Design a protein with these regions (language model features):
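Key residue(s) within conserved catalytic/signature motifs
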Residues: 1, 43, 47, 76-77, ...
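Radical SAM enzyme core and accessory elements
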Residues: 1-8, 12-16, 20, 49-53, ...
Length: 389
């Protein structure tokens, strides 16, 4: 089976009135899925149903805010991001534009009669902003939206080399209910190999600071298949993450992305033969009380394997589910942002794209604001052609 959203197929078949037996045959017979993988996908679909129902209420939406800056570029990354040291002068003008775009999104959402459901500030690395810049951005969010009615507010605090106690306190003070601290691995050697300028101990210290700041819903990302890692090394990272007891642990499989340094250095998929054995260690998560709640795949992922979000009961990441299952409008702010407008139960969709690079986003910001008027227009008129950038 190929495709990004295998769980979506289960939801679609159920919505079409298929029996559970016919769905089983579809996956196990037609696509020859492994029973273990299919049972996981089906359990995820069962868990998601009430969450999707809540997120599918007409005219609800989630807000994504992108911060395309990082302290360094990881070897596996192909996202649009700027080196913080090289492009620091661009950061403040970018934040100023971003705040103005958030205000415009609020105006257009109100005009369209939309209700905010969740917020996600991602990147890049959002904590590459200074504490004052985080206050400016998150203050703008708080001034424009009633956070008491938001189901979830996530900020990626991914890297300990730019996440300190002050920033963690700001994130908490300004209303975030969920953060993500992303070690990827707890091996110092592997961290150095992928271009991370911090140690495993720095991750532990950052996690402790987050708990001291009062953060009660923390996700941690790990990647199976990183260069130089082993099955034993990945198991160590998994056990270390479990020992910290975060509410979420997301296990990604390495994807060989065309613009990443890994691919440019001509490393091949057969250099990562142990990745399936690494993912088999995820039984440790189930044994520790975590359960899978969302699943997706990407093109060029090692051995066509999957990315799975695991959580403790009651700590499912709503935004992750909504964006992956395409049941809800996502309004996006920032460079590279892709707004996805959804109506009529997913039968009508339209995208509005922001400019890809931060400098172009800043220089052509008036056009960014003009395009956002398409949000209200979408809900006033029939679906038209996609707006591209």
């Amino acid at each position: 089976m190929t495709g990004v959203r295998p769980v979506r197929l289960i939801h679609d078949k159920r919505a079409a009135g298929w029996s559970e037996e016919d769905i089983d045959q579809f996956f196990l017979g037609r696509f020859d899925c492994s029973r273990q993988k299919y049972q996981m996908a089906k359990a995820i679909a069962d868990l998601q149903e009430p969450i999707l129902k809540a997120g599918s209420v007409p005219k609800t939406y989630s807000l994504y805010i992108g911060i395309p800056f990082c302290p360094s570029r990881c070897s596996y990354c192909s996202f649009v991001s700027c080196n913080l040291d090289r492009d620091r002068k661009m950061v403040q003008p970018y934040v100023d534009c971003l705040c103005r775009e958030v205000e415009e999104i609020k105006a257009q959402a109100d005009k369209a009669g939309l209700t905010l459901c969740s917020i996600y500030i991602g990147g890049g690395t959002p904590t590459s902003l200074s504490a004052d810049q985080l206050r400016q951005l998150m203050g703008t969010v708080r001034e424009n939206f009633d956070l008491s009615k938001v189901m979830e507010y996530t900020v990626e605090a991914g890297r300990p080399d730019c996440t300190d106690a002050e920033k963690l306190a700001v994130i908490k003070e300004y209303g975030a209910t969920r953060i993500s601290i992303n070690p990827q691995t707890f091996s110092d050697e592997v961290l150095a190999g992928i271009g991370r300028k911090h140690s495993a101990q720095d991750i532990l210290d950052c996690y402790a600071d987050a708990r001291k700041a009062g953060h009660e819903d923390i996700n941690m990302d790990l990647i199976a298949g990183l260069p130089g890692d082993t099955v034993e090394g990945f198991e160590h990272s998994l056990r270390q993450a479990i020992a910290l007891d975060p509410e979420n642990i997301t296990v990604h499989t390495l994807t060989l992305k065309r613009a990443s340094r890994i691919v440019m250095e001509d490393q091949k998929e057969n250099d990562y033969a142990d990745v399936a054995a690494m993912l088999e260690k995820c039984h440790l998560l189930a044994e520790a009380g975590y359960r899978p709640y969302y699943l997706y795949r990407q093109k060029n992922t090692l051995q066509n394997l999957e990315n799975v979000g695991w959580c403790k009961p009651g700590h499912e990441g709503y935004y992750n589910i909504y964006i992956m299952e395409e049941v809800q409008t996502i309004l996006s702010a920032g460079a590279g942002g892709s707004t996805k407008l959804v109506a009529d139960g997913g039968k009508r969709m339209q995208r509005i794209f922001n400019f890809k690079y931060p400098n172009e986003y800043i220089q052509r910001f008036a056009e960014v604001l003009e395009r956002k008027k398409g949000v209200a227009d979408f809900y006033d008129h029939d679906l038209g052609p996609e707006t591209v950038g």
